[in-house]
Swiss-Prot record:
InterPro entries: AAA+_ATPase (IPR003593), ABC_MetN_proteobac (IPR012692), ABC_transporter-like_ATP-bd (IPR003439), ABC_transporter-like_CS (IPR017871), ACT-like_dom_sf (IPR045865), MetN_ABC (IPR041701), MetN_ABC_transporter-like (IPR050086), NIL_domain (IPR018449). PANTHER family: AMINO ACID IMPORT ATP-BINDING PROTEIN, METHIONINE IMPORT ATP-BINDING PROTEIN METN. It is an enzyme of class 7 (translocase). Residues 2-241 form the ABC transporter domain. It catalyses: L-methionine(out) + ATP + H2O = L-methionine(in) + ADP + phosphate + H(+); D-methionine(out) + ATP + H2O = D-methionine(in) + ADP + phosphate + H(+). Keywords: Amino-acid transport, ATP-binding, Cell inner membrane, Cell membrane, Membrane, Nucleotide-binding, Translocase, Transport. This is Methionine import ATP-binding protein MetN. The gene is metN.
Length: 343
């Protein structure tokens, strides 16, 4: 549905030359929810704006539904963009128009008959859960409701693709979840292809089928969500995954934790499990093999793309030789082990 080939984008600011994208290629199949994650300034907004040519690539080709956009005339491009809806971090609603009027706007600009506009807008507002808000104005809506209006407006022309530019980053966590569930439902009902960009791995984890990691204008890692969470290949992907798990050292342990070993101490470990290592009974196996005992302090597990992953804080009791052997064995079995200190 979306095929980007060798996309490069260069900006010129006075005497400065900024390369925002460098030889980016990616294919997003029809009906898929595809996420692009990266830090601020990584190039993700430039990338998504190249899909509908809000930013025209310096080099490369953009195919959407088999049509090469970079060679179209302005009138042809305007027509092609009707098949590409887009929502943003800021909702860009017209304050002087009602909810109905905002959703109806693209249909009015396309000279759609009034009866058809009424039918289509009513259908869309029901789809996004705002069937009772036809006559409300944006000033009377919550942030989540405003984004729902923006989604309905983006779908008014019955597009095949929906682009989401940090669409939930201005929303609170509960509202973010509801908007993501709405996007997932729309994808399922309409078979809509969704390309979203975000700096939050929680967004990717919740609804995406595949994900690409962008850094300094390049896609440095890309795969299914389950594969990236199970076997992240780059430090940046690992960092984003770690950001979805929050496990603090309890206060009483913080007070006792030492950076260097001391008499009768035990190491405190941070264990990171992904993929097959989550389900395997590795801690009980270390106890059996190496005569160590693990005192679990706290743990957190989660799912992404049907795959479990998680982290655990534990004290490992045993001789120095046995604990070192147990740690090495865990690492051999794809558990990331960090010695936080000694207690």
């Amino acid at each position: 549905m979306i095929k980007l080939s060798n996309i490069t984008k260069v900006f010129h600011q006075g005497t400065r030359t900024i390369q925002a994208l460098n030889n980016v290629s990616r294919h997003v199949p029809a009906g898929q929810i595809y996420g692009v994650i990266g830090a601020s300034g990584a190039g993700k907004s430039t990338l998504i704006r190249c899909v509908n040519l809000l930013e025209r690539p310096t080099e490369g080709s953009v195919l959407v539904d088999g049509q090469e956009l970079t060679t179209l005339s302005e009138s042809e491009l305007t027509k092609a963009r009707r098949q590409i809806g887009m929502i943003f971090q800021h909702f860009n609603l017209l304050s002087s128009r009602t909810v109905f009027g905002n959703v109806a706007l693209p249909l009015e600009l396309d000279n759609t008959p009034k009866d058809e506009i009424k039918r289509r807008v009513t259908e869309l507002l029901s789809l996004v859960g705002l069937g009772d808000k036809h006559d409300s104005y944006p000033s009377n809506l919550s942030g989540g409701q405003k984004q729902r209006v923006a989604i309905a407006r983006a779908l008014a022309s019955n597009p095949k693709v929906l682009l989401c530019d940090e669409a939930t980053s201005a929303l609170d966590p509960a509202t973010t979840r509801s908007i993501l569930e709405l996007l997932k439902d729309i994808n399922r009902r309409l078979g809509l292809t969704i390309l979203l960009i975000t700096h939050e791995m929680d967004v990717v984890k919740r609804i995406c089928d595949c994900v690409a990691v962008i850094s300094n204008g390049e896609l440095i890692e890309q795969d299914t969500v389950s594969e990236v969470f199970s076997h992240p290949k780059t430090p940046l992907a690992q960092k984003f995954i770690q950001s979805t798990l929050h496990l603090d050292i309890p206060e009483d342990y913080q007070e006792r934790l030492q950076t260097e070993p001391f008499t009768d101490c035990v190491p405190m470990l941070r264990l990171e499990f992904t993929g097959q290592s989550v389900d395997a009974p590795l801690l009980s196996e270390t106890a059996r093999r190496f005569n160590v005992n693990n005192n679990i302090i706290s743990a957190q597990m989660d799912y992404a793309g049907g795959v479990k992953f998680g982290i655990m804080l534990t004290e490992m009791h045993g001789t120095q030789q046995d604990t070192q052997a147990a740690i090495a064995w865990l690492q051999e079995h794809h558990v990331k082990v960090e010695v936080l200190g000694y207690v």
